[in-house]
Amino acid sequence: MLLIDELDRTDEAFEAYLLELLSDWQITIPELGQMTAEEPPVVIITSNRTREVHDALKRRCFYHWVDYPDFQQELDILNRKAPDAGADLKAQLVSFVQKLRQQNLFKAPGVAETIDWAQALVELNCVALDPQMVDSTMGVLLKYQDDIARIQGSEAARLLAEVQAELVTSSIAVR
């Protein structure tokens, strides 16, 4: 098995190299010459869509979109990765992050940011989200200044109020 993670972050020379590998199951290494696989490996390629991957390379791949987890799946991930965060805090922050993903952002927060945010909030002894805490830790979730500027302040407070109202009315089992 061969994992090529974040292909879109490589240069075109690497894509050409990979194209040779996927076309003929062989590679050319200047110091060693041409090497051919005895058995074609299973190749998994990931991309974060930071740039377009060459069409010739995409034609040799099966495409599978992996969407963000739903609320319960992301909560389960946090239960494993941030066990010190309280159940109510985890429910609030997962719901908040999922609302952020629905906004028109340059880069929506991924699961890694959800985990990082939970761990940061634990370090800050946070037991429940409030607008000030959300604003002061927004940089853990959003990685572009335009996104932060768009969400911080009244928009973050509005999203948080929605989260809190939904969690109260839905009686989501968070434990």
Language model segments and positions:
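C-terminal regulatory/interaction module of P-loop NTP-utilizing enzymes
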Residues: 1-175
